[in-house]
């Protein structure tokens, strides 16, 4: 299984039979050269409705006839746009043909902002996503603050790879993310949601080096790792 980081919070997971992408914010993402029209995906997983996470979902979903899995209100909102959606909610899990998806809580917001019309559309609660696929469990925390139930998530799940935001200001920063990594007990932890904009500038290497046991891993935008 191949896992690729495309900057910000964009993660792509490729197996022999499926291609899954998390939070496909490509247009406006200064850290990647990947274009929406280049993306091949049959599943799109969304953590919440902010524009820097929903990103190019509509284009990618329509050109690939991809299934969009998202928190309920966001899924319904995208369904109104003609996308094929599957709504879920926090605490809920479902087995799909590609693997198992479970939504966890995240402490953040969730809304689609239309700057041209000066409107904000509420899209339910934000979430983290546990994806169990090909015998491995990947945790995408979404945008979130540190919260103590991360301990429970770590106790209940054997997480092989966790993606944690470190940008601060809108999410937890490096210090809180370090504690989150400890609580989640993932075998490998990759920082995300940093350096896309000046307000979330961080040193990912310093964060990774601060994690005990060598579990920290910085992925450059476009880098792929094998998860076997």
From Swiss-Prot:
Gene3D superfamilies xrefs: Ribonuclease Z/Hydroxyacylglutathione hydrolase-like
GO molecular function, one term: hydrolase activity
Stored InterPro entries: Metallo-B-lactamas, RibonucZ/Hydroxyglut_hydro, UPF0173
Keywords of this entry: Hydrolase
Tree of life domain: Bacteria
Record-annotated disulphide pairs: none
SMART domains: Lactamase_B (SM00849)
Family: Belongs to the UPF0173 family.
This protein's name: UPF0173 metal-dependent hydrolase RBAM_026340
């Amino acid at each position: 299984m191949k896992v690729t980081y495309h900057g910000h919070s964009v993660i792509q997971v490729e197996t022999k039979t499926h291609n899954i992408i998390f939070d496909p914010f490509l247009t406006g993402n200064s850290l990647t050269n990947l274009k929406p029209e280049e993306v091949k995906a049959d599943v799109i997983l969304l953590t919440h409705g902010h524009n820097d996470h929903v990103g190019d979902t509509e284009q990618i979903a329509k050109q690939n006839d991809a299934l969009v899995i998202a928190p309920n209100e966001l899924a319904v909102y995208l369904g109104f746009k003609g996308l094929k959606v599957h709504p879920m909610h926090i605490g809920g899990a479902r087995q799909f043909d590609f693997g198992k998806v479970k939504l966890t809580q995240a402490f953040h917001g969730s809304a689609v902002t239309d700057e041209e019309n000066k409107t904000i559309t509420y899209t339910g609660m934000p979430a983290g996503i546990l994806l169990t696929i090909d015998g491995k469990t990947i945790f995408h925390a979404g945008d979130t603050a540190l919260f103590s139930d991360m301990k429970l998530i770590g106790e209940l799940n054997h997480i092989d790879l966790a993606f944690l935001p470190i940008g601060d200001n809108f999410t937890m920063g490096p210090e809180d993310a370090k504690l989150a990594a400890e609580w989640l007990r993932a075998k490998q932890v990759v920082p995300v949601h940093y350096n896309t904009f000046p307000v979330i500038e961080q040193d990912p290497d310093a964060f990774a080096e601060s994690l005990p046991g060598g579990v920290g891993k910085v992925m450059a935008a476009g880098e792929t790792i094998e998860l076997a």
